[in-house]
């Protein structure tokens, strides 16, 4: 028996919106401590890892560890039927091939339930090794989204360079080049407006902007984003979900040989 009740139902809607364009079908793994999802995108370039801890739910019951395969597009369609203030309950029975989403209005004068068919999905659980990162940048998530959007109008890739002076986002395209530098800035009224850089060694890596822009769909989940980088490791773009968990996106860097020759 599985039953989870989330008072802030809009949170689940935002989580789905942030990952559904990257991942089509995925297994949600439920345990007594919370539920998680880990899946590669369809082109096997990016990895999504989601965790929502049980203590963030008003009611959380999971009698035994269970995995439910869901189509995220279909799940998103169902969650869109919930009002932003609705309380969302997820129910599942052992051995059932469906999951039920129940939406209650805050005044409880309207209750809707939607039943969705589950899928059998073969997916290997990829061990994500813990790593020490050379550079970790914490910055306002809206600023990161704006930078990725602006640079994508110029080029296809972004070079993220971290030095003790700051973090630089650069791109080049047919019409020219663009460089945006953020200096460390901790003297702000609100902590979420700060740009904080922890750096052991300078790092400079290149990534596809198409993916970075997709990751920024998680911006509504958190005021801040944390970008962790080390040479030869995928970048980690993390959005913390208040008191509950996180959505993390892992993206392999583009290697030098991926780049076209200048003038080619």
Curated annotation (Swiss-Prot):
Phylogenetic lineage: Eukaryota, Viridiplantae, Streptophyta, Embryophyta, Tracheophyta
GO cellular component: PCNA complex
Protein's GO biological process: leading strand elongation; mismatch repair; regulation of DNA replication; translesion synthesis
Organism: Populus nigra
Function: This protein is an auxiliary protein of DNA polymerase delta and is involved in the control of eukaryotic DNA replication by increasing the polymerase's processibility during elongation of the leading strand.
Name of the gene this protein is made from: PCNA
UniProt keywords, alphabetically: DNA replication, DNA-binding, Nucleus
Pfam families listed in its UniProt record: PCNA_C, PCNA_N
Keyword Repeat on entry: no
Compartments, record wording: Nucleus
Portion annotated as DNA-binding: 61-80
Assigned protein family: Belongs to the PCNA family.
GO molecular function, one term: DNA binding
Residues spanning the signal sequence: none
Protein name in the entry: Proliferating cell nuclear antigen
């Amino acid at each position: 028996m599985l039953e989870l009740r989330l008072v802030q139902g809009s949170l689940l809607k935002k989580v789905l919106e942030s990952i559904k364009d990257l991942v089509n079908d995925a297994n949600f793994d439920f345990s007594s401590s919370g539920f998680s999802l880990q899946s590669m995108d369809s082109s096997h370039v990016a990895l999504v890892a989601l965790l929502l801890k049980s203590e963030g739910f008003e009611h959380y019951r999971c009698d035994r560890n269970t995995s439910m395969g869901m189509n995220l597009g279909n799940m998103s369609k169902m969650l869109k039927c919930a009002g932003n203030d609705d309380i969302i309950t997820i129910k599942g029975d052992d051995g059932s091939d469906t999951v039920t989403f129940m939406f209650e209005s805050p005044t409880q004068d309207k209750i809707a339930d939607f039943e969705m068919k589950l899928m059998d999905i073969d997916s290997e659980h990829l061990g994500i090794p813990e790593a020490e990162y050379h550079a970790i940048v914490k910055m306002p998530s809206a600023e990161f989204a704006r930078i990725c959007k602006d640079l994508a109008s110029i080029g296809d890739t972004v070079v993220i360079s971290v030095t003790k002076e700051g973090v630089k986002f650069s791109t080049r395209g047919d019409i020219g080049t663009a460089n945006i530098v953020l200096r460390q800035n901790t003297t702000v009224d609100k902590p979420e407006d700060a740009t904080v850089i922890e750096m052991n060694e300078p790092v400079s890596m290149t990534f596809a902007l198409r993916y970075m822009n997709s990751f920024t769909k998680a911006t509504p989940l958190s005021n801040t984003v944390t970008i962790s980088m080390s040479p030869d490791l995928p970048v980690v773009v993390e959005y913390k979900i208040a008191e509950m968990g996180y959505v993390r996106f892992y993206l392999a860097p583009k290697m030098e040989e991926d780049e076209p020759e200048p003038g080619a």
